[in-house]
Amino acid sequence: MQFSLVMSYYCLACFLVMFALGRAIKAHTSKLPPEGVGTIRLQSDPLSLHMAKLYEKYSREGSRLQDGNTVRSFRAQPDSQFGSPLYRFNLSSLQQTEEVLAATLHFAPVKGSRSSRDSYCKRSKKSSCRLLLPTQHQKISLVFKSVIQNKTLGSEKWNTTNIFHKRAAWHVKDITNIIKDAQHERDLFISMEISFGEKFATVFENNPSELPYILVFADDRAISDPNSIALTLQRYDPFQPNGGNSKQAPNTFPESRVKRDTSDLASSHDNELPDIKYMRYSKEDLWESTYKSLKHKSPRKEKKKKGQENEETLPKSPVLHFDERTMKKARRRQWDEPRVCSRRYLKVDFADIGWSEWIISPKSFDAYYCSGACEFPMAKVVRPSNHATIQSIVKAVGIIPGVPEPCCTPDMMNSLSVLFLDEGRNMVLKVYPNMSVESCSCR
């Protein structure tokens, strides 16, 4: 008897310990971010999670996707001012340059839509009543209307009835033709009513996790245009004083900026960097060209180089003054870099350029850049074009003055997927081309 009593207490204690441990584990895991979206800091509602998965897919597959380069999301806004519950969508951010490829409506089964027959048969035990029960599918009608000036409810535009599975967590409806018509007719404010058979939904969902949303997959024809990323992501002029909003075009700057010398402007037109007057070095002093590496330098030039390291022989800078130790480190760092045209590392943080407030992901990316000389003879590794080869020969011969060396420029580039909020706080996913340098060449 005592043994059985002890075993009973022991089993009860084990049960309580396991129960407490299970609750502790559940409480801990509930605080963890969803898998795969912790790095982009999204909310846990279905729309945010859906866009997070699309971002991961587009980042993984890049330009190989057949779904275009743009995904726009539109969350429904509940509205009951027109008598019956409905949802409004503001599609005004959809651009004319974005060719709609596909559009889907996502909505949850509305609660309280069960008919009186369903409730009666659930309480009844008659087999005849159960035979009259509907199947696991449900007829749902979607009525779309235009909204004039975002206030007056317009005429009915689209009416579609479909059969959905009752046990589905979320329903998905293809509304590509509806969105295409709305874009073509510029009816970018639309409303939607959901009805079950002849009865409209009586439960009005205002919970963000239950609100319907629309995803539009489009191909933006203007995304490859010059300065396209600034047109979509730059919200203010970075050169504007005090960071205020600017009404100028993204590629213009205030008139109050410091004007450069005309000689600098002339040098920028011929692909040459402006001369640094306070620290002039000849090409032979900074670098040994590849075809002169085995040639012994004369003592005169060596003496000249040693003299350059003397602080007294360095001309004074009109802007900045550095001690000799700092200058030696800078020159040593410059000499350590590869002489030939090549890809150099550059990491861009969107916070540094003031875009982090609306860019969700990525927070930063490896952009790289191209730098280096394209002198004759050019190595095969820089993949020079025929024109660049001829230009380098003409430059080396020197028979035509003013001809610059070929430029070190990106040859192959990769795209970058960016998930951000537009000015209407809608989540947008775009795949911008030519965002990261993969290789460089002389052109």
Swiss-Prot record:
Disulfide bonds join 341-408, 370-440, 374-442. Gene3D superfamilies: Cystine-knot cytokines. GO terms for biological process: anatomical structure morphogenesis; osteoblast differentiation; positive regulation of osteoblast differentiation. Keywords: Cleavage on pair of basic residues, Cytokine, Developmental protein, Differentiation, Disulfide bond, Glycoprotein, Growth factor, Morphogen, Secreted, Signal. PROSITE patterns: TGF_BETA_1 (PS00250), TGF_BETA_2 (PS51362). Residues 297-306 have a biased composition (Basic residues). One of its GO terms (cellular component) is extracellular space. It comes from the Eukaryota. Residues 256-270 have a biased composition (Basic and acidic residues). This is Growth/differentiation factor 10.
